[in-house]
């Protein structure tokens, strides 16, 4: 029997709050249309079964359509913003400020338990930028969906179609950014994972006998080493599967001339859209439990990774002895400040996360 483990935080509920009303709207629309006897509305030009979502949304259910489209859109944007927040400690567009409890702390173990990061921080600036891009692109896409519900197909058909197209394109790009973010995080985590292959050690100064590269960054982008199928990679793969099917069904929706079949694909896409929220919720749940992870606290070193180096205060080497807090040996490897500022000074540098 599968036992539900206590979450690290309750933010994983946010995606569910976002998409459940969306599902409720879709079901309510179908029920209303069926109870009315499957009518063909005055602005429609041919018989079809079923009708498009926007056709029902252009009737007396228009307020429901607008409110639920707006709620779902706001929920998606907040969800991506929370992804950024949990991995960085601040929201997109929010100015960073010094947190003494983090920057002045003396060990990596203490920082893990400090509450600064609710999910594992990103490893490079590329991942940070991808989350931010997903947030911006998703905001534009969801605004387009809201406008498509406001400009009904009955009264503003061309504007409605244009807004739907903008929504599809920008949500595709937003999802691509999330996929790239998770693949990058999975690629870096694979190399430091305790289950990584013993023939690949990115912290070692000696190359393995069957390995031509020392670090992940020296590997070609298409090569992976270590424990490849970690939680980040699995999540990215699920998102790829979701997006691939969504693209196929979106093409069918737009390309098929039979309006009845086209409408079927639109309804399928609308319900399929909720699945991405479920995947994001799983990301939040698993990521929020990283302090209790079977493997994360036993990673020997995150040395050289952007966010972790900053969280460590960067430039002192020390061994953190086993304790009740860290439940294992965590060696925090760092470098002297002159590596980063080309100065001869060995004085430590404090970096605000």
From Swiss-Prot:
Record PTM Phosphoserine, positions in chain: 208
Listed InterPro entries: DRAM/TMEM150_Autophagy_Mod (IPR050911), Frag1/DRAM/Sfk1 (IPR019402)
Transmembrane residue ranges: 12-32, 63-83, 131-151, 161-181, 232-253, 264-284
Source superkingdom: Eukaryota
Topology versus the membrane: Multi-pass membrane protein
GO cellular component: cell periphery; plasma membrane
Residues exposed to the Extracellular side: 33-62, 152-160, 254-263
Disulfide pairings: none
Cytoplasmic side: 1-11, 84-130, 182-231, 285-353
GO terms, biological process: actin cytoskeleton organization; lipid metabolic process; negative regulation of phospholipid translocation; vacuole organization
Keywords tagged on the record: Cell membrane, Lipid biosynthesis, Lipid metabolism, Membrane, Phosphoprotein, Transmembrane, Transmembrane helix
Pfam families: Frag1
Keyword Lipid metabolism set for record: yes
Subcellular location, record wording: Cell membrane
PANTHER family: EG:22E5.9 PROTEIN, FASTING-INDUCIBLE INTEGRAL MEMBRANE PROTEIN TM6P1-RELATED
Function (record text): May control the production of phosphatidylinositol 4-phosphate (PI4P) by the STT4 PI 4-kinase. Mediates proper localization of STT4 to the plasma membrane.
Family classification: Belongs to the SFK1 family.
Protein name: Protein SFK1
């Amino acid at each position: 029997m599968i036992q539900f483990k206590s979450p690290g935080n309750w933010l994983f509920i946010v995606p569910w709050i976002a998409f459940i009303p969306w599902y409720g709207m879709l079901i309510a629309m179908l029920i209303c249309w069926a109870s009315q006897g499957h009518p063909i509305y005055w602005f429609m030009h041919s018989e079809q079964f079923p009708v498009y979502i926007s056709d029902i949304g252009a009737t007396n259910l228009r307020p429901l359509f607008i409110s639920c489209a707006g709620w779902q859109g706001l929920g998606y944007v907040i969800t991506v913003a929370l992804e950024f927040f949990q991995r960085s400690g601040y929201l997109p567009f929010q100015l960073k400020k010094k947190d003494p409890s983090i920057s002045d702390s003396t060990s990596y173990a203490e920082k893990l338990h400090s509450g600064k990061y609710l999910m594992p921080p990103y490893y490079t600036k590329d991942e940070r930028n991808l989350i931010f891009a997903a947030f911006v692109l998703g905001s534009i896409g969801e605004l387009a969906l809201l406008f498509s519900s406001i400009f009904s197909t009955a009264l503003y058909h061309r504007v409605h179609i244009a807004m739907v197209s903008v929504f599809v394109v920008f949500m595709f790009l937003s999802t691509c950014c999330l996929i790239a973010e998770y693949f990058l995080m999975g690629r870096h985590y694979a190399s430091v994972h305790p289950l990584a292959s013993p023939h690949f050690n990115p912290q070692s100064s000696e190359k393995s006998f069957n390995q031509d590269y020392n670090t992940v960054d020296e590997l070609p982008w298409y090569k992976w080493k270590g424990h490849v199928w970690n939680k980040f990679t699995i999540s990215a793969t699920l998102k790829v599967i979701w997006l691939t099917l969504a693209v196929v069904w979106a093409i069918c929706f737009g390309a098929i001339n039979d309006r009845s079949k086209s409408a079927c694909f639109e309804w399928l896409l609308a319900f399929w859209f909720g699945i991405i929220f479920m995947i994001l919720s799983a990301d939040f749940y698993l990521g929020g439990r990283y302090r209790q992870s079977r493997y994360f606290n036993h990673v020997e070193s995150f040395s050289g990774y952007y966010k972790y180096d900053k969280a460590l205060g960067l430039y002192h080497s020390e061994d953190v002895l086993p304790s009740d807090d860290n439940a294992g040996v965590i060696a925090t490897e760092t470098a002297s400040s002159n590596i980063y500022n080309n100065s001869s000074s060995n004085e430590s540098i404090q970096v605000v996360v």
